[in-house]
Amino acid sequence: MGTRFLLALFLVLLVLGLEVQADPESRQDEPASPALLAQMRESFSSYWDSAKAAAQDLYQKTYLPAVDERIRDMYSKSTAAVTTYAGIFTDQLFSMLKGEQ
């Protein structure tokens, strides 16, 4: 799952890096207007959506049902064990606090 996250992060940074490399002559020292901010927000939103779609598509392609089933099985077994040991710990704690009466 870490590699998927890194790949998605790489795609986002690549898309943003390509957007940042603009023509130096087109840069101006004017304050940002509301229309420019709206355009930048829309551009960022579209790039984010495309990166998200690419990451989702990559996840769909690399999805392994056997691994997912193993993870679900390990989760259910570990939660059952934790529940059992938490109950034992709670009983021991109550018996220590209550003492012998």
UniProtKB/Swiss-Prot annotation:
Component of chylomicrons, very low-density lipoproteins (VLDL), low-density lipoproteins (LDL), and high-density lipoproteins (HDL) in plasma. Plays an important role in lipoprotein metabolism as an activator of lipoprotein lipase. Both proapolipoprotein C-II and apolipoprotein C-II can activate lipoprotein lipase. Its main location: secreted. GO terms for cellular component: chylomicron; high-density lipoprotein particle; low-density lipoprotein particle; very-low-density lipoprotein particle. One of its GO terms (biological process) is positive regulation of phospholipid catabolic process. It comes from Tupaia glis. Residues 78-101 are annotated as: Lipoprotein lipase cofactor. It holds the Pfam family Apo-CII. Keywords: Chylomicron, Glycoprotein, HDL, LDL, Lipid degradation, Lipid metabolism, Lipid transport, Secreted, Sialic acid, Signal, Transport, VLDL. This is Apolipoprotein C-II. The lineage of its organism: Eukaryota, Metazoa, Chordata, Craniata, Vertebrata.
